[in-house]
């Protein structure tokens, strides 16, 4: 069944209510998806894109009900990925000589998928036009790496419709086609999820490409995407959101995610979150167990956040596999303007923390101090976690803290004057163990109240057995 988009433009795509995985199993399409194909019937008949390959036969049969396939004059392929051009082989078997208009890179992609170099390819580049009669033209705009090298958009003059390819789309299936007909909360959640998980790596390209398109000074009455809704009501709203999201986007939000073997790291996550909330109640904090949560929801929250705390138990002296995989994915997504801190519990060694901190730094995050706890955290260890959260809230605050929390901090500092007189706490740079002068280290005959300067030179870190030379002043206390 076709749907009139505008005048002589019809949607001839395919809804996919059941799909739950995309890009293999990397993207969870919890609300299904659609594969949008458009038929333009002017003096020349143009088909823009096809559908996913698994619907090839159904697509060609439905298209045959709309038009004699021999009457299709041109096929435009904005993107060669299988969910866009997947039905080409089935269609071209019926009309093998029909010209295909696409970018030079798309020819390589199409042949790589379909293996038909004999098809009638016609290369287009930015600014090229194709006259389709009745005073209307198609104008082509290359958009390489949004999100494949072959990508382009197509603009139809007269009707002022931009066929935008993957940009401005969402994996969202609904019986209605237009943006003003669907649930707005669901729609914009899926738009942001789509951008965060698919287009984030190319944010640096989004703004200049949108600026280039706007530079054509062409009116845009509708944006017809390759997935999800057609934007007919205020279509520029999604363009404005893309410009916002592309500009090193962050909200006053912190995401905490972790994996754990014995719930020890979960206890740390909860305590850290408590400390953040105590110090800055304005900040939104979300906690996820990666083993039980939707990975794409976690990544969307990271995209929205000013910072992320990542927790892992130590297993075989490295981080938990699900954490390693998610950090690798964050590396590929290339988030910008975000801070990070690693935390976790361990038994006899804590190698995961150092490895995790390094990986987060390699992923482009600005790193804050990490935090370790040995075995199951007791009340003292949980208080250290809460204090870590308080310090994170202070360091990552986007605006001056509320006066009530500032007063609390001042009061705590006043009550701790005696402790402060003992000098700073010191942290082992290898295992992150903290020496607190107020507590000393009775196991090595270092009495409570002993400043670091008076600790014997033969002192060894209780965790990793290294000497005083590997200790640094605790970063949160450095002046």
Swiss-Prot record:
Q: Tell me yes or no: is Zinc-finger among this UniProt entry's keywords.
A: no
Question: What PANTHER family does UniProt report for this protein, alphabetically?
Answer: ANAEROBIC NITRIC OXIDE REDUCTASE FLAVORUBREDOXIN
Name the source organism.
Shigella flexneri
- Presence of the UniProt keyword Heme in the record: no
Its predominant location is cytoplasm
Cellular compartments annotated: Cytoplasm
Spans annotated as Zinc metallo-hydrolase: 30-210
- Cross-referenced SMART domains, in alphabetical order? Lactamase_B (SM00849)
Organism classification = Bacteria, Pseudomonadati, Pseudomonadota, Gammaproteobacteria, Enterobacterales
Q: Which residues are recorded as binding Fe cation 3? A: 428, 431, 461, 464
Taxonomically, the superkingdom here is Bacteria
Question: Which residues hold FMN?
Answer: 260-264, 342-369
Family annotation (NCBIfam families): PRK05452.1 (NF003954)
**Binding annotation for Fe cation 2:** 83, 166, 227
A Gene Ontology cellular-component term: cytoplasm
Listed name of the protein: Anaerobic nitric oxide reductase flavorubredoxin
- Which CDD domains does the record associate with it? flavodiiron_proteins_MBL-fold, rubredoxin
**What is known about its subunit structure?**
Homotetramer.
**Record family assignment:** In the N-terminal section; belongs to the zinc metallo-hydrolase group 3 family.
Q: In which pathway does it act?
A: Nitrogen metabolism; nitric oxide reduction
The cofactor named in the record is: Fe cation; FMN
Q: Where is the Rubredoxin-like domain?
A: 423-474
